[in-house]
């Protein structure tokens, strides 16, 4: 039958038979132009099976420290017409950070924005001047919704404590930032019934001022671990990740502790948080699913229920959450999973049903994506954040830089220019001099470690300048009347003392008795130091009797160094016209001057604007040297996903410079990469594998040597190199990753091509790589693109695409184009009249790319899956647009059917939108607008009755 004609005719007859009704704008569609609602493959990061069930861990990718909120469909700020969930997660040093993820069913999630573009402009956040923020930055964020406003609170370990960000529009911003200027461990924000804001941190609670800027009440250690020993059968330790929820008459606070079974949920409850009411506790060991949220679900009958949303360590992929259904007993305690038994790979029925087309769409949304770098992502409001007061270079008198500032430091003119500090005697000696003909003997120091030589530096010292000091020292003498035989070595300092008595040590060194020793060091004078009246002094460390020994000193030197410090500039963070997909994050702050999607259309350009560091140290604890790769700026990465993960990219390396290395890396502190390296004009393709071992340890496990040979760490592995011909400027690299979450191991096989068609193995399989448990990076493996310089800046590499697949070359499967052909056929069958023009145009662009991919005789499954999944996702979006009638909300937020949110009944909530009702014969009845039928409408109806379908009436956007 002609579905289009029958449907229009029935509608037109209904209009003609009803006086005073105007033809309502509605979608028009035909049998051969309807996108299928047959479930497509789920995204790489979903465990939604498509049959109404899902498994845990749920997202198959790294989403730690989760905090989840629900915005009810009845909320005036909800424009989606159905319950919406938002989630935030830890991203530490990555930029942008604090991703806001969205879901309609608590199982399928996608990123809609970030809270901030960069967390600070500090050296540590920007990999500047040898500093870094690995394992630091943003930790354990808390997301809350209160009185129409959204709040995110998180702590930082290296950026002056905790911050609160808030906005009235969580998906579009802008966000306002508040610095609390103090730290809280794993803080969670909570608004009490009077609307007062509180921070929950472990077993501590703090009330904030109404403007959220100040702590006005502190209640610490309100409970103790010991009081729960009987309830839990063990004494809990930790109390991390506490979040508080009011459910019925009780306040429930899930927290985690390390119990005898491992990561364990302790659920606390009380009728009042602070009035002394008893806190009860219940222990849940849920297969190591622990820290996270309780989430509320509409039961469809006017009631709601609460369920668990906790994550577990699932390396090498990362820390992955799971939605764990709960039933609540008459005692007011939840029972999670199967009688509180939960295991990885458990399968559950989904708690929220969605209409078939919307279900098909959200299953394809992902936290990772392929990308062809077409600069077609929308500009985000967080990119425009300009909160920064940038550090500026000091104003320096260059005539005092690079010259010796100490007068008579070799004492060839005796004691001229020198005066004793804290008494003591200064004597020029020639017998036993350390250098030249004369040295200085320092005697009669008494009990003063500060007794020694001093010299005025007034008019010579400058704020913000780094100085290098040195001195040669020897001591042989025992002090008169004091047994100092036990003092075999002692610390000496060359220091700057300011007029107010403050002392900054410039050079520090240990001098052994009887050994002539030169101590050296550097120090940067603070920018706010009062340098007027300052002087250079020599001291020994404060110590026991016998440490104010006589000594001889010579060649005291102090030189101001030329400023080699790199200072931030506004161009680093100002938008550069390039907009990346939201799945991408930079390792630390990017420098926007040195990456682009516009310099070469359809390519990502990474330019080396900085050189990597050969001296940088890990800054969070004592975890040793950083590799070159770890100090490379503008490393662009995505999450990995568990199981088989293949990434393919195409690089143009024609503009590399000597000392440059560029490629594709899978990394945490341990890493592997395939890259092109240029040395002495010759480019070589190779593989690097770096396994971090926490340094050299003694028998007790203490780190005794945490230094590395950086060149050796990133040398190409034997048997894994290819010398590139001079004309080989295009290189294709494929990284086939196997992330085995059961064993915790990652293995990688690299492949390469020089023509994009014929592929060869690049070395042997690399691995296994594991998680080092030092918490130094503290995240699952990431995978991304990089380019770094050791010798020269200015070289650049262009990346054509980033194509994902879950099929590995080593699987031995032929390239399968059937799904790509099916998507193309489906797209070709559609008619533009039924869809919003902007979404239709997106589909046409993706259809063209899909056809080009098919015509190119693809050589890998990546080259098929990337365009197929992109096109299939857009077809699913069109199906939702068709059902909603106007496509007003990407993701189906303006649906005419609400779905069965509880699995009970058949809700058809309209989200406040006017709908057509459905008759038994599947025709659509027309809704009344209270307007008269105009001649134009009557003409349109006449044409419809005649079977003429060339006229299209589209719903106007609202």
Enumerate the language-model features and the residues they cover:
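C-terminal low-complexity, Ser/Thr- and acidic/Pro-rich disordered "stalk" regions positioned immediately N-terminal
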Residues: 872-873, 877-929
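Sec-dependent signal peptide cleavage junction
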Residues: 22-36, 927-928, 955
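Hydrophobic core segments of beta-strands in well-ordered, beta-rich domains
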Residues: 64, 68-94, 113, 132-134, ...
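Beta-rich interaction/scaffold domains
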Residues: 813-893, 936, 944-946, 951-953
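Extracellular and organelle-lumenal recognition/adhesion modules and their flexible linkers in secreted
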Residues: 395-566
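Short beta-strand-plus-loop segments that form exposed binding edges in beta-rich domains
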Residues: 312-313, 538-547, 787-791
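Extracellular glycan-recognition regions
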Residues: 35-45, 332-334, 340-402, 510, ...
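Blade-edge beta-strand/turn elements of extracellular beta-propeller
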Residues: 42-60, 109-131, 165-182, 211-237, ...
């Amino acid at each position: 039958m002609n579905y289009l004609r029958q449907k229009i005719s029935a509608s037109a007859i209904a209009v003609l038979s009803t006086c005073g009704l105007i033809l309502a704008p509605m979608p028009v569609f035909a049998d051969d132009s309807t996108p299928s609602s047959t479930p497509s493959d789920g995204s790489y990061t979903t465990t939604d099976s498509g049959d109404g069930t899902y498994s845990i861990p749920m997202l198959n990718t790294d989403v730690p420290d989760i905090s989840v909120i629900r915005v009810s469909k009845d909320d005036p700020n909800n424009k989606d017409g159905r319950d919406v969930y938002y989630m935030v997660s830890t991203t530490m040093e990555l930029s942008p950070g604090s991703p806001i993820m969205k879901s309609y069913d608590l199982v399928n999630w996608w990123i809609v924005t970030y809270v901030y573009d960069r967390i600070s402009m500090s050296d540590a956040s920007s990999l500047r001047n040898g500093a870094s923020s690995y394992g630091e930055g943003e930790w354990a964020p808390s997301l809350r919704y209160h009185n129409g406003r959204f709040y995110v609170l998180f702590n930082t370990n290296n950026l002056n404590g905790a911050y609160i960000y808030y906005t009235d529009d969580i998906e579009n911003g802008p966000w306002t930032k508040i610095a609390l200027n103090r730290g809280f461990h794993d803080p969670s924000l909570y608004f009490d019934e009077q609307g007062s804001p509180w921070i929950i941190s472990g077993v501590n609670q703090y009330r904030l001022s109404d403007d959220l800027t100040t702590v006005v009440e502190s209640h610490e250690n309100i409970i103790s671990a010991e009081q729960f020993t009987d309830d839990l059968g063990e004494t809990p330790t930790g109390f991390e990740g506490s979040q508080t929820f009011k459910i019925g008459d009780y306040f429930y606070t899930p927290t985690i502790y390390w119990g005898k079974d491992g990561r364990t949920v302790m659920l606390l409850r009380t009728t009042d948080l602070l009035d002394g009411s008893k806190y009860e506790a219940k222990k849940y060991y849920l297969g190591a699913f622990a820290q996270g949220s309780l989430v509320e679900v509409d039961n469809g009958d006017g009631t709601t229920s609460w369920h668990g949303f906790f994550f577990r360590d699932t390396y090498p992929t990362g820390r992955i959450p799971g939605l764990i259904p709960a039933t609540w007993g008459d005692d007011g305690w939840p029972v999670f999973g199967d009688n509180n038994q939960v295991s990885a790979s458990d399968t559950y029925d989904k708690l929220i049903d969605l209409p078939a087309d919307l279900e098909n769409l959200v299953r394809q949304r992902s936290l990772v994506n392929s990308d062809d770098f077409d600069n077609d992502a929308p500009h985000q409001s967080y990119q425009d954040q300009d909160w920064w007061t940038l550090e500026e270079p000091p104003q320096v008198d260059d005539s005092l830089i690079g010259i010796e500032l100490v007068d008579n430091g070799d004492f060839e003119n005796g004691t001229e220019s020198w005066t004793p500090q804290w008494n003591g005697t200064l004597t020029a000696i020639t017998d036993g001099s350390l250098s030249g003909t004369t040295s200085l003997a320092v005697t009669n120091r008494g009990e003063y470690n500060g007794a020694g030589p001093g010299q005025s530096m007034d008019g010579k010292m400058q704020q913000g300048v780094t100085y290098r000091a040195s001195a040669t020292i020897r001591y042989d003498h025992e002090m008169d009347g004091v047994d100092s035989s036990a003092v075999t070595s002692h610390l000496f300092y060359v220091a700057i003392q300011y007029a107010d008595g403050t002392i900054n040590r410039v050079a520090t060194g240990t001098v052994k008795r009887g050994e002539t020793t030169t101590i050296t060091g550097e120090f940067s004078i603070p920018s706010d130091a009062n340098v007027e009246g300052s002087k250079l002094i020599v001291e020994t460390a404060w110590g026991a009797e016998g440490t104010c020994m006589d000594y001889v000193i010579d060649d005291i030197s102090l030189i101001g160094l030329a400023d080699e410090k790199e200072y931030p500039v506004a161009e680093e963070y100002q938008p550069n016209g390039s907009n990346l997909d939201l799945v991408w994050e930079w390792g630390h702050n990017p420098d926007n001057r040195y990456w682009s999607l516009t310099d070469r259309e359809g390519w990502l350009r990474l330019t080396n604007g900085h050189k990597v560091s050969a001296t940088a140290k890990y800054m969070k604890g004592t975890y040793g040297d950083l590799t070159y790769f770890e100090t490379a700026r503008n490393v662009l990465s995505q999450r990995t996903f568990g199981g088989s993960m293949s990434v393919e990219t195409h690089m143009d390396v024609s503009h590399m410079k000597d000392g440059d290395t560029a490629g594709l890396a899978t990394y945490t502190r341990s890493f592997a990469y395939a890259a092109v390296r240029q040395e002495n004009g010759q480019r070589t393709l190779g593989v690097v594998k770096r396994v971090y071992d926490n340094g050299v340890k003694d028998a007790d496990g203490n780190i005794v040597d945490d230094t590395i040979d950086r060149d050796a760490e990133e040398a190409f592995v034997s048997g894994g190199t290819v010398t590139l011909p001079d004309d080989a400027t295009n290189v294709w690299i494929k990284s086939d990753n196997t992330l085995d979450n059961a064993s915790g191991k990652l293995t990688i096989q690299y492949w390469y091509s020089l023509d994009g068609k014929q592929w060869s193995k690049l070395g042997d399989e690399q691995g296994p790589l594991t998680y080092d448990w030092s918490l130094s990076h503290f995240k699952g493996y990431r995978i991304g693109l990089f380019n770094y310089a050791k010798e020269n800046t200015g070289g650049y590499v262009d990346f054509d695409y980033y194509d994902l697949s879950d099929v590995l070359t080593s699987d031995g499967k032929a390239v399968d184009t059937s799904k790509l052909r099916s998507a193309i056929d489906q797209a070709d069958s559609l008619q533009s009249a039924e869809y919003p023009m902007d979404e239709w145009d997106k589909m046409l662009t993706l259809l063209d790319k899909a056809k080009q991919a098919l015509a190119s005789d693809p050589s890998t499954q990546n080259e098929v899956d990337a365009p197929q999944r992109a096109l299939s996702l857009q077809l699913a979006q069109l199906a939702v647009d068709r059902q909603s009638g106007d496509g007003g909300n990407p993701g189906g937020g303006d649906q005419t059917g609400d779905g069965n949110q509880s699995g009970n009944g058949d809700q058809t909530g309209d989200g406040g939108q006017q709908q057509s009702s459905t008759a038994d014969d599947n025709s659509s009845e027309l809704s009344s607008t209270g307007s008269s039928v105009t001649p134009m409408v009557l003409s349109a109806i006449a044409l419809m009755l005649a079977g003429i379908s060339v006229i299209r009436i589209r719903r106007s956007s609202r």
